[in-house]
A protein has these predicted regions:
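Partner-binding and oligomerization surfaces adjacent to conserved cores of proteins
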Residues: 1-216
Length: 216
């Protein structure tokens, strides 16, 4: 499912800090978009006098971003915190994909970067460029680094279908119930399009704070 950013568990997700590198450039662009004959100089004065322009820009971008959908993936399947937070306390499953087998579904993947401050978005630059989408969707607080996240962006927040061939593995959590494991494997084996899927299970290491992946 591709969810709207407003539904994410982190309220800081997709936030940014607006800056105006060139008031003249912004004023010129606004004047050109208007049906009335506004002079850029008058628009520039209005911008400088508007103390809420940053807040209004943030609200406008939020509205646009929340029309779209994002699906979040990870480059790792053995991270303890990921299993604790997103897999029903290690009772859930992790799906493994070969993205090359479904390029349409996994189009425009964004590798998330992690830092202390919001990304800066220049209000005076044209909106909607890939650079700004990547900055908004691909920047998170540095404490989330363990997620090693990759995001895929779609036009609408809704469910999308992936090609079955792209699903290559299912890994069960170390606390997954035996009946759940049996049911999932049974369903996959009964579907000719999923006969290639490999099954694994995490096991708690006996000496270190880590998970080992064991083939079933």
């Amino acid at each position: 499912f591709f969810a709207a950013p407003s539904s994410f568990n982190d309220p800081f997700d997709c936030k940014f800090s607006p800056v105006i590198a060139s008031v003249k450039k912004l004023a010129s662009e606004i004047a050109q978009r208007q049906t009335l004959d506004y002079e850029p100089e008058n628009v520039e004065r209005a911008i400088l006098a508007d103390s809420a322009i940053d807040a209004n820009f943030v609200k406008a971008v939020d509205r646009v971003m929340n029309r779209h959908g994002i699906c979040c993936f990870s480059r790792k399947n053995e991270e303890i915190l990921m299993w604790s937070h997103y897999a029903d306390s290690h009772k859930g499953i992790c799906l493994g994909f070969d993205v090359s087998k479904d390029p349409d579904f996994f189009v425009f993947p964004i590798n998330v970067t992690y830092q202390d401050n919001y990304p800066k978005i220049d209000v005076s630059q044209p909106a909607g460029t890939n650079k700004y989408v990547s900055a908004l969707l691909g920047t998170k607080y540095k404490k989330w680094y363990y997620e090693q996240e990759v995001r895929v962006y779609k036009e609408h927040h809704q469910a999308y279908h992936f090609i079955p061939a792209s699903l290559v593995s299912v890994t069960f959590g170390c606390k997954a119930e035996a009946k759940i494991i049996e049911e999932v494997i049974s369903v996959a084996n009964a579907n000719i399009e999923l006969n290639h899927v490999r099954f694994y299970k995490t096991e708690m290491d006996k000496e270190a704070y880590k998970l080992n992946i064991v083939k079933l």
